[in-house]
Swiss-Prot record:
Residues 281-311 have a biased composition (Basic residues). PANTHER family: GROWTH_DIFFERENTIATION FACTOR 6-B, TGF-BETA FAMILY. The keyword Transport does not apply. One of its GO terms (cellular component) is extracellular space. It comes from Danio rerio. Pfam families: TGF_beta, TGFb_propeptide. Expression is correlated temporally and spatially with somitogenesis. At late gastrula stage, expressed in the posterior presumptive neural plate. During somitogenesis, expression becomes restricted along the dorsoventral axis of the trunk neural tube in an anterior-to-posterior progression so that upon completion of somitogenesis, expression is seen exclusively in the ventral spinal cord with the exclusion of the floor plate and adjacent neural cells. Residues 1-21 form the signal peptide. This is Growth/differentiation factor 6-B. One of its GO terms (biological process) is BMP signaling pathway. Residues 280-311 are annotated as: Disordered.
Amino acid sequence: MCACGILLTFTLLLHFLGVHSMNPLFPSASRGMKVSKSVPAEGNRRAKYGKNVLSASLLSGDIQSRRAIKDAIEPHDYMISIYKTFSAAEKLGLNASFFRSSKAANTITSFVDEGQDDHLNSPLWRQKYLFDVSTLSENVEILGAELRIYTKISGSFRASETGPVEIQLLSCQSHTVLDSQTLDLEDAHKPKWEVFDVWEIFKERQHHSHGTRFCLELRATLDNPEREIDLQYLGFHRHGRPQLKKAILVVFTRSKKRQSLFYEKREKIKLWGLDSIGKERRSHSKTRRSRRTALPNRHGKRHGKKSKSRCSKKPLHVNFRELGWDDWVIAPLDYEAYHCEGMCDFPLRSHLEPTNHAIIQTLMNSMNPSNMPPSCCVPSKLSPISILYIDAGNNVVYKQYEDMVVESCGCR
């Protein structure tokens, strides 16, 4: 499927699900398509995922402290809308082929601006945005990048008296103009998100540099480049800006190799230190042993007569808190994974889609059970789920993880 066709599919998906934020998952979406660059802010419609936490220490190794830090990080509305869109699509079975395309991004990472304004009462002619992108893996293909800046024009700014305003995004190193657009002054005093395409410069920077910081600079001009406007009048200043209204760099990537959920856990292990993880593992191990002792066997007796039920899909409810993963997983906190269980005995049913090898093995087992075990009841089809989580650098990440839900079972 060509990039344009995939983008059209995605646009229709957003429209169908009632999500109206721009979401370029492909290079064509962020650098080739000239769509509206001003996205209305969602305001109070944002779901409250985080809670204010006064202080917590990540290096303490304490699980509750790590959970408190996770709770203090609130995802931007944009990341929540991405998660909700694709989670809903997965439930409806709409985006399976969409994400299987080699062009599609399966990971979207948001980096929050760490820059500071120089002076409170001085004119703001240039605004620098700094992002720590050190957690971005080298084993990913960068498919798109955009800078999203929340702005609300000051009430003292008279748009009708100034004429069109052009805002320009520049490289901090070369000061070359990367992107520019005319500020939409209609309903200018309503809050909105301005979106800039930074895919080319970010890809070049990642290719030639291994630094941890990515820097961009913003300025605004009137009818010629010499007449710059104080950015504070246009609402680009940082003073009094809450965390959820800070600028974010959104990077769209696709992993060059399949990653498991344990990849993020390993990255956090490196950050937390081995001692704390050793204690956590021992604690979880004791908990698991006590659960095995206290809880009855779900599958009945392990010894004696075997179950006669045939291979089929059975419930398996996964709770990330019980796994100890709720210190980094934002959503979902639980989901239905299902599992496969039952006998693969002769004759094998066609709906189990047995392989030729499984058919032969099952036939041999029926003739001589003591010498040949039966074929195994395993997942024959799996589907992905969307996960919104916090990475080792405390960045909010959306990722679609493959092979998370059993759709059907078979004998292998």
